[in-house]
Amino acid sequence: MKKIFQFITAIAVVAPVAISATSEPLTEAALLTASTISQAMKAMPANAALDQPLRTVDGGTANVGIFIVHRPQEPDQGCTIEHDTLVNDRTTSIFLVLDGAGTLVTGGRLANPVPLSSDDPDLKLVGSGSRGDGIQNGRSRRISKGDVVIIPAGVPHGFSAVEKSITYEVVRIDSGKILPLK
C-alpha cells in the first residue's frame, strides 16, 4: 500500500487535476466536469493500482468525496482474496464502474482484521476502518461497466478477481469526517 500511496503522490505532482482545495463550507453545489474526470483517468497508468481523490467537500454531517480507482489484473489472483480487503467503520462507498470488470466480494466477515493506523496513507483515502486477509462467507458478484454498487459502512469488501482491469468512480460518504477536504 505504501508503494501505491507514493505512486498517487507522484501522479498528483506530475499530472495535477484542476480542482481547487477549500476548507470553507460550500454555499453552492460542487461540480466535477466530464473533462476533469477524463483527465484523471488518462493520467492513470494501465498497470498500477491507483485510488485518486478528485474532490472532497464538507457535507454537513459527513465529508463527501469523489475518487477514481483503477485496478489492473494481478498475476497472483485466484479464487480467494488475500489482500486489499477492507471494512470501513463510518464510510459508505458507492461504486460506479466506468470501464472493465471484476468479481467483487461483499458482506460476511473480514478475516484477521487489523485497524488502519493513524499514519496509514489509506486512512485519507477510505476513512477509518480495518484491513484484512480476506473475507469469510461473503457474496461474490461480477460487476462491469455501468454497474453501481452501494457498500454501507461496516460491510467488508474487496475484489477476488479483475478481468484485465477495472476503473470505477467512488463516492465516499464519511460520517467520521476523516477524509481531508480537497
Predicted regions mapped to residue ranges:
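Short alpha-helix capping/helix-loop boundary micro-motifs
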Residues: 133-138
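Short, conserved beta-strand element in jelly-roll/cupin
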Residues: 89-104, 108, 118-131
